[in-house]
Amino acid sequence: MYKEKRISKGEFVRIRGLNYHVRTWPGIDASLPPLVLVHGWMDVAASYQFMVDAFSDAFAAGRTIIAPDWRGFGHTPSARDGQADSYLFADYLADLDFLLDHYAGDRPVDLVGHSMGGNVAMMYAGVRPARIRKLVNLEGFGLPANTPAQAPGRYVKWINELKTLHRGELTLKAYDALEGVAQRLMKTNRRLPLDKATWLAAHWSQPNSAGKWEILGEAGHKVSSANLYQVEETLAIYRSITAPVLAVEASDDSLSLWWKNQYSLAEYHERLRQVAQCTIAVFEDAGHMLHHDQPQALAQLIEGFLD
């Protein structure tokens, strides 16, 4: 199994009534801005371990690195009592704001977000521009444009999926053994080697009382949002970002693989033109989980950008 180079400290912080699980790698130089890493959908904070291990000794020793499990993922619950049956995207922004109050106070931070976490990071940087010094967006593309005419159908879909969830028909697969979880991760990402997949599986799942390995993500995350994605609102927020932004993409073009003709890289790049200072970087031989596929190269790029 993969052996981590830098051991994180796991702790729980009370955030908006939830016991938020946060991994930290403490640094020795309090004058440096904290580096905050936020993960994507159906992922966990530990997903950044390979990238953290790839940072140079000087960089990793100097900065405090902070990586939370979003609500309903990893070891962070989604509700004070039980599990939420649907999620509001704005809650991630508020959770992040409270987390920064706790860990950074009034100091600006450097923020890295992957996928859904990249979307949160971009929105947050426009809502609270003074709190972000620099931002790295790892394939946080946003979503395809919608039309108002889609609203009735979206509400119907949301309600129907809630009923499916409450009937127990919208679940996450459980696995007989940890090896099964590792194989699932390798099937999703063909570049992920067995040693890293096994390590990730142990942090991405846990055994239940019956001995089955369950994914550390709540089924409510599979329910569609009741709210349509608002491109014009997103662009207005992008225009409010003052921090330099590094937008990193993988050569596999996962955006086209997911959305086909609904949303393209060209459209995403056009949206990024609304950000005052934005640089785009593309990683070869990488897919959507580029922090797993190219951790050394990504760590080096981030260090140079944050310098």
Give the label of every model feature segment:
Residues 274-307:
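Catalytic active-site module of serine/aspartate enzymes centered on a nucleophile-bearing elbow/loop
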